[in-house]
């Protein structure tokens, strides 16, 4: 075996050390999304039942966070590129703590509904900004610590931290609000953000990357095809997250929550076991296979005659969706100079925010007009379009590589 080939196969110890370096910074993403997940399932009931507002107002008060995240993506990318990932994460955690203080105030002013809802909306807006800063900063911090060769692993672990925290946070938040009082959630958000801020300060920053910085508009244009692919793939996740329980209820099937569990389990399992395939086979090839699995799973949900088939469909969808973000994300980030990686990552992530924001209302229209199964058929068509788009991008990349080699 040559020295080059020996070096290309990391030892178990070096692989573990790399993973440890990644986890040490994406843990701040976990903390950030815990502050999001803890009050998430409690707030709609608080706004509707305690404050007396309509379900529409309750939904809007929760959803405003996602618009804040979307609007602050350019800010997060610029901060990560110019201030550095560590300072970006610290600012994001500070915003999470501030959102906790505003949330605590909203609970304290529950006797005055108008004041309480204003404080709650302010809390959600600040939390959305914090989510954007921490999510972008943590990924770039991880890449800076382990090198660009491990981009896919960093993005994959960051996603595990994100969905893991949301899965844990929501039920824990409900349990705490029932056992104690909802105001405790505000205190817990402040405490978690403070803990994250303290721990983040202890970790060494990575050097700023100097060099050419592209304008955000130029970066957005460059990653547009990859972002469209991400949006197509996210439609399946959005459809399952929003409508799987209603789909089960319409068919009088039990255990709708189990389908969400298997979706999440296969999602995390795929990221843990197969993230390295992106480095080995390239992002586009992995994306093509991932979209195909997602499409197959969504078609099974559409046609499922019994709950067991729907369960397999949810599992395949989670398995397929798992690697779409990192697979296309690695290719998107590679298109820009190193000094613009933060902008590329934030611009690419915008399409996830947009897709999840648009999928709900569109899928709701489809469900009302044609029935719940057709929601998953439409998502399957989107995944099939993702296969086609990824194939075109892969072929274009191969042509460019071939012409470059010939030159």
Swiss-Prot record:
It is a multi-pass membrane protein. Pfam families: MFS_1. This is Uncharacterized MFS-type transporter BURPS1106A_3201. It is found in: Cell inner membrane. InterPro entries: MFS, MFS_dom, MFS_trans_sf, MFS_Transporters, MFS_YhhS-like. It comes from the Bacteria. GO terms for molecular function: transmembrane transporter activity.
